[in-house]
From Swiss-Prot:
Keywords: DNA damage, DNA repair, DNA-binding, Glycosidase, Hydrolase, Lyase, Metal-binding, Multifunctional enzyme, Zinc, Zinc-finger. Binds 1 zinc ion per subunit. Signal peptide: none annotated. InterPro entries: DNA_glyclase/AP_lyase_DNA-bd, DNA_glyclase_Znf_dom_DNA_BS, Formamido-pyr_DNA_Glyclase, FPG_cat, MutM-like_N-ter, Ribosomal_uS13-like_H2TH, Znf_DNA_glyclase/AP_lyase, Znf_FPG/IleRS. It comes from Prochlorococcus marinus (strain MIT 9301). Its EC number is 3.2.2.23, 4.2.99.18. It holds the Pfam family Fapy_DNA_glyco. Belongs to the FPG family. It comes from the Bacteria. A zinc finger (FPG-type) spans 258-292. GO terms for molecular function: 8-oxo-7,8-dihydroguanine DNA N-glycosylase activity; class I DNA-(apurinic or apyrimidinic site) endonuclease activity; damaged DNA binding; zinc ion binding. Monomer. Its cofactor is Zn(2+). The gene is mutM. This is Formamidopyrimidine-DNA glycosylase.
Amino acid sequence: MPELPEVETVRRGLEQKLNNFIIKKVEVCRDSTVAYPSNKEEFIKGLKNSLIYKWDRRGKYLIAQLKEVQNENTEFPLENSQNNGFLVVHLRMTGYFKFIENSTHPCKHTRIRFFDKNNNELRYVDVRSFGQMWWINKDLSINKVIKGLGSLGPEPFSKDFNANYLKEAISKRTKSIKAILLDQTIVAGIGNIYADESLYSAGISPFREARTIKKNELIKLKKSIVIVLKKSIGSGGTTFSDFRDLEGENGNFGLQTNVYRRTGRECRKCGNLIERQKITGRSTHWCPNCQK
């Protein structure tokens, strides 16, 4: 599943490529991709003549701020134009976007297509079809419509995410620290890859009970999380199967991982073999010598 660095890579690509993109037509190729409104025609109607004004990210969600455009000759910028709600996207396991100039026939696994007046297309492709989209009317609360958004913990790059916050959040938790990092209500956007890599960087065993981790270790863990995530974003994220950026390119962070998917290979620090075991159903990679 795309995690924070992959979603942020997509967000940056969308923001760069879709400057002043006005949706003139929407084609829903798979109804189940539209999570809200329940009527796909309402989804299509709501998005038509909307300018994609700005792309944001919250955890693993992409959020497009929309502006209402009645006249194609409207002058930019449109800061003062009427809001037209939000387009929210969760890529889930295999979803990704493609931007196509002078659109052609849809490729296999195309789920939703957005067109501008010049027939440029923003295409959403999803092999396993778990991804979802929401059009949220300007009069509605995003957090009320999408329950998962409202329950997200702080962003790893935010001031709210620090050692003091972590210490309080885990003080009574008997779960492993790996399970804690995967809990989106505690910290938003971290998944299996970056939990493993961050714990390795911090020298903390993924099996440690969260409540046993000392504050000085949490300071190091928070720093490691930020460093690992920034490094991955700089590499365009990680591609092991379906993830692509807007240009169709793979992420390169997978070539730099220290433990993730390196089972049986030598630790880059100590030479000990990397091991793998499941924690709460998720494959976990670590170095028993470097992580305590």
